[in-house]
Amino acid sequence: MEAREATATGESCMRVDAIAKVTGRARYTDDYVMAGMCYAKYVRSPIAHGYAVSINDEQARSLPGVLAIFTWEDVPDIPFATAGHAWTLDENKRDTADRALLTRHVRHHGDAVAIVVARDELTAEKAAQLVSIEWQELPVITTPEAALAEDAAPIHNGGNLLKQSTMSTGNVQQTIDAADYQVQGHYQTPVIQHCHMESVTSLAWMEDDSRITIVSSTQIPLIVRRVVGQALDIPWSCVRVIKPFVGGGFGNKQDVLEEPMAAFLTSKLGGIPVKVSLSREECFLATRTRHAFTIDGQMGVNRDGTLKGYSLDVLSNTGAYASHGHSIASAGGNKVAYLYPRCAYAYSSKTCYTNLPSAGAMRGYGAPQVVFAVESMLDDAATALGIDPVEIRLRNAAREGDANPLTGKRIYSAGLPECLEKGRKIFEWEKRRAECQNQQGNLRRGVGVACFSYTSNTWPVGVEIAGARLLMNQDGTINVQSGATEIGQGADTVFSQMVAETVGVPVSDVRVISTQDTDVTPFDPGAFASRQSYVAAPALRSAALLLKEKIIAHAAVMLHQSAMNLTLIKGHIVLVERPEEPLMSLKDLAMDAFYHPERGGQLSAESSIKTTTNPPAFGCTFVDLTVDIALCKVTINRILNVHDSGHILNPLLAEGQVHGGMGMGIGWALFEEMIIDAKSGVVRNPNLLDYKMPTMPDLPQLESAFVEINEPQSAYGHKSLGEPPIIPVAAAIRNAVKMATGVAINTLPLTPKRLYEEFHLAGLI
């Protein structure tokens, strides 16, 4: 798909940051080097649960170049929460504050007990290795089931159950039992890591006015400012956060990670710059993971394929600290409710502490796990009833005018039926399905399909606010200051398209300055929940309309015209009745506004808007694969995602988002799993050699298609797209493997080892 100059949304154009990235001029956090900068390295626990009885750091302190060593005794005794959620005035709804900068009571393999600061990174690493600690080990808990046992050792005061909740539309069990056919399933999903290209790094120093500046690879600069203030008990305004280019986050950097520690260290060392940079192994052990879910599901379906009701009982493993905690399990149940809204639905969930590395936000935020269970059960019902898997979904899919059964919120745009129909045609579903019947050999083909629903922000659970400030420069170009966060997803590019379309200028005349500095940009919580373009759009559009109004008013004075007769097209003032005849360039107008001795001034506009709508996006995955029974190997032949994300703002970027999500979904389905010893809690594969991810030879040609149905609640007709592409992929692959082999496998990932075990039980090998 060709990228070209654009003047509006709906057009493909080159990313505004493309040249900086391909030329190497883009600066990431680790590229920042300052005079006198020091480096910090952690001393981490080799055990998953216990206490540090004593610590000996004499050898480490004697090493030349070591400046300081801090232990749990030296840090503030202030528990804080790290989840990147908008702040709330309701104390009962705030995230659990169960973290300290360092701890004597270690709760997972790799927990931090001390930190070394040295003049160079190698010295800091060597000194950290020289710190000797005597440990008192405690019983290790690795599963929610063990955590909830009566005799389970408490990981935190208050017990191992972090939170539980129940949602229901009524007597769901009775509805399921009354249906013609019932299906049950027990589903398990693994602990996985985000594996973003850039590791976690933070750099902090103290300014002349004693304020702390932090440069960090984060999705949530303005939330980082708040949490650092809370962790160190200093005013939030005394913290300044600079976000340079970010090499991916996928939810991991929606947690406040190393910023509080970097800020603490510089404050203790007289304000010198201190960098805290994690290795890849540390990213596995000490950042965040995807929550492992155990789901017991029931579903009732009539013979004609009508879904009468379903229920899900979820156990969520949040690991050693709360992080995003129960919000993941709760959100997963809420988001899937839109998918098949005309049936009874019950969802109960418990989130438990264990001695695993902490789980947090990851692309899909609970929805991939829940959709895996729902779409597996529905597919099993279709098989048992002899109904085409696409047909059973079409009969139950959300449609315009339906409502979320839990909240009653109306669905104003629902393109799921159109996605299924379009996908069926592009994929040649009937032809491929017919080719996969009655197979007996070692190589067996199967096709599968799965659907999803996903919302466009966090409202009403979280406050959704966004700000935008537009300034016209002397040459007529426009600077856009936004509190939103570009982390590689292309947000700045679509923001420039929004402003260009609304004001009436080329995209090349718009420069977006997203949250690169919390001191100068308007407020916005950050990049998460597929919210960025949806929530930022109203503020951007409002400010753009106001700026356009000011520009035309100034032009009317210059041209002695009524403002009603003028408009802006491609950066030129024109008469509404003769748009093909430019009267004045925006540059000429800007020069007059700045330098005329009497009239004008710098033309600017600002807006801050809270969003109180949250429409669902929909879509589906079609997959064709081959299973080698003898080798227990799955090869994907073709995969297609079809999305209803409303108006597509930039087709080229949208395609890239979908392909990236599909690749992650394939990894979750077939390869990825953190292998954790069930007895010791030790992570056995905290590196990119032993942790298996799909590489280019493992991925087929990724295909995407879109159904554009305007969302009337949206400023530009669009809905979420960032996270949805990953959601249905694993379920579609599982369903295709079932068709190929007749074996329904309900535990991810579908590795050769797991396939061997399941095929052996089924008598295939």
PLM features: residue spans?
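C-terminal catalytic domains of large/alpha subunits in multi-subunit enzymes
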Residues: L63, W72-E73, D233-C238, S267-K275, ...
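Flexible, low-hydrophobicity surface segments
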Residues: M1-Q164, Q182-G185
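Extended active-site and interfacial segments that coordinate phosphate-rich ligands
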Residues: V16-A20, Q129-T142, Q219-P221, R226, ...
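Active-site-adjacent "gating/activation" loops or surface patches in catalytic cores
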Residues: Q219, N457-N479
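Glycine-rich loop/linker segments at domain edges
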Residues: E11, D17-A20, L89-N92, L161-S202, ...
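Thiamine diphosphate
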Residues: G249-S277, A491-V499
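Short glycine-rich loop/turn motifs
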Residues: T103, E198-L203, T294, G446, ...
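Short acidic, glycine/serine/threonine-rich loops at helix termini
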Residues: P79-G84, A127-L130, C195, S216, ...
